[in-house]
């Protein structure tokens, strides 16, 4: 069940007589934030609510059989944080792109100077920098 304390208490009272023994596992916003903090992920309040709502989407038979593990919650936290959209000033993003690109040059040039292949981690990061540059360029043209 997912909802406010008041809603959940009402639903539980309607579904189970007052003397029914129950065991509840509760994921509160604080527990989700603590788990995210342990993953070095900062979540906004709406993102925490999204994580809690998505925990409810785990099939009931799976929840009954194995509960909602911290691993399942961590996967949802990762998905929510990866899909987040942010707004930054174009000038700041351009500066960050340039700084990131220059930081990668040293490793790229060192490899090339010794006739070695550029490390895969460098080429992956360069691809991310290029992707950011393209997004910035496209957005600037659309809004300019």
From Swiss-Prot:
A Pfam cross-reference name: DUF1380
InterPro entries registered for this protein in UniProt: DUF1380
Alphabetical UniProt keywords: Plasmid
Protein name: Uncharacterized protein YubF
Protein source organism: Escherichia coli O157:H7
Gene responsible for this protein: yubF
């Amino acid at each position: 069940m997912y909802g406010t304390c008041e809603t959940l208490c009402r639903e539980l009272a309607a579904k189970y007589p007052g003397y029914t023994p129950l065991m509840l596992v509760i994921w509160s916003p604080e527990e989700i934030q603590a788990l995210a903090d342990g993953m070095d992920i900062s979540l906004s309040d709406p993102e925490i609510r999204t994580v809690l709502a998505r925990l409810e989407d785990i099939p009931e038979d799976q929840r009954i059989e194995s509960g909602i593990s911290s691993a399942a919650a961590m996967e949802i936290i990762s998905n929510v944080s990866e899909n987040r959209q942010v707004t930054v000033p174009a000038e700041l993003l351009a500066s960050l792109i340039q700084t990131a690109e220059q930081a990668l040059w040293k490793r790229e040039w060192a490899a090339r100077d010794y006739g070695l292949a550029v490390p895969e981690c460098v080429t992956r990061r360069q691809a991310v920098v290029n992707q950011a540059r393209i997004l910035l360029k496209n957005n600037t043209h659309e809004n300019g």
